Amino acid sequence: MSTVNVQIGLHELLNGSNAQIQLSVPQLVEKVLMRDEGKLTSTGAVSASTGKYTGRSPKDKFIVKEASVADKIAWGAVNQPISEEHFNKLYTKVLEYLKEKEELFVFKGFAGADRNYRLPIQVINEYAWHNLFVHQLFIRPTEEELTTHESEFTIVSAPNFKADPAVDGTNSEAFIMVSFEKRIVLIGGTEYAGEMKKSIFSIMNFLLPEQDILSMHCSANVGEEGDVALFFGLSGTGKTTLSADPNRKLIGDDEHGWSDNGVFNIEGGCYAKCVNLSHEKEPQIFDAITFGSVLENVIINDQTRIADYNDTTLTENTRAAYPMHAIDNIVLPSVAGHPNTIIFLTADASGVLPPISKLSKEQAMYHFLSGYTSKLAGTERGVTSPQATFSTCFGSPFLPLDASRYAEMLGEKIEKHDAKVFLVNTGWTGGEYGVGKRMNLGYTRAMIQAALNGELAKTETAKHDIFGLEVPLHVPGVPDEVLMPEQTWADKAAYKAKAIELANEFKANFKKFDSVSEDIINLGGPIA
């Protein structure tokens, strides 16, 4: 199937009598309720459930193996190839399926808040609530922008269309396929709305580096003086909590680009976890869930329509989607200058990493590639004790290119803009999980504050004898003994043994990076 035929098929779909294009939020909310796709909550949000798929399906995600990208993609378990033939046949079937639907919903918008680098996109949805979701998550065009909008990538989403693995070359009924040549994302068999968000992120992770822009899985905020901070960290490290600072404005909570102009948000909204959400703990998120917001897999009281954020009957991965303007303390448009400070967050359950360390450029690249944290019991089926987990660049499921490409770009930008990088351990202190205790949140906030305001630039440090990290000896508001992890352990020999064990896990994980420079390994990793 040629690109021309793809465009003809899309044109027919978009011009069909069933296509509802660029409906407003109230119109979409009406459609969701009339079509019985979801319920209205007491705060005016729409609540919908996603059936058996309550999270992403990494084993069902494919990139079409096309001549123009075949030698650029890092093929493997994350970027699984599928043939053009399989894609073309499935694409044709999905389009025929959607043409028969009574209604389709179309959103046109952008990914990328920097107008120089934004990607015009369109999303064709079988579900009205999915269209409401993308309306809130991506960047909405002005009326003037809409008149000249020409989509460069299209998501075609048909959750009720089930693939046949024997015929379609998939691993299950669900599929998420990206064709870079045809500029199409094809999604079916899963109702989980996050697949649309993350598909566009994966695409930006391919397109932006081609323009010398580093794409990043991180949150970002800016201080009153215009100083920018990035927060990288896997689930459970405190990224959302620590980047929500009343004295700093949020640029974005999840996906960013770093160009020669500075940092920009890729999205126009937030997709926040809301398990155990409360106004006391996270008022920004709690207050953002108003009319037009989307709740995913959150249990709602049948009579009062009040959301119960503590109920994990459907999943622990309950989510809320809302536009950036639903939060008070933000920068709009979501662009800012070059980062002054970069924070890597890790929740080390072995209790051996320092609560804060200063990183050299090589150490920053090493820890960026490592993307370490601990997977805790309860976060994944089968995990009963904490396990070391490594997610390359803090976002391996979304990286189509070789990881070293992103790391090299990070190193170049750190050097060029003199960004200060810190590794912050929000995990355990005084012993490993089960013996020690979780790091005091007040101490972590004080350490991050000291990093942001430049106090750690002049403080005395000591080199950690196993990890080679520069550990500050004094941080305002934090007891000195907390800063050196060994001092918090009663059994010093047990500390050393556990630290060497983790250092060896870092080294074993790093063996997969065969294309990185020796400097990163020799100057960036553990020294014992």
Swiss-Prot record:
Cofactor binding, per record: Binds 1 Mn(2+) ion per subunit.
Pathway assigned in UniProt: Carbohydrate biosynthesis; gluconeogenesis
Cofactor or coenzyme needed: Mn(2+)
Disulfide bond sites: none
Binding site for ATP: K198, H217, G233, L234, S235, G236, T237, G238, K239, T240, T241, E282, R319, T444
Biological function: Involved in the gluconeogenesis. Catalyzes the conversion of oxaloacetate (OAA) to phosphoenolpyruvate (PEP) through direct phosphoryl transfer between the nucleoside triphosphate and OAA.
Major location category of this protein: cytoplasm
Annotated substrate binding sites: R56, Y192, K198, R319
Source organism of this protein record: Bacillus cereus (strain ATCC 10987 / NRS 248)
Protein name: Phosphoenolpyruvate carboxykinase (ATP)
Entry-linked SUPFAM superfamilies: PEP carboxykinase N-terminal domain, PEP carboxykinase-like
List of residues binding Mn(2+): K198, H217, D254
GO BP field: gluconeogenesis
Family: Belongs to the phosphoenolpyruvate carboxykinase (ATP) family.
GO molecular function, one term: ATP binding
GO cellular component, one term: cytosol
PANTHER family registered for this protein in UniProt: PHOSPHOENOLPYRUVATE CARBOXYKINASE (ATP), PHOSPHOENOLPYRUVATE CARBOXYKINASE ATP
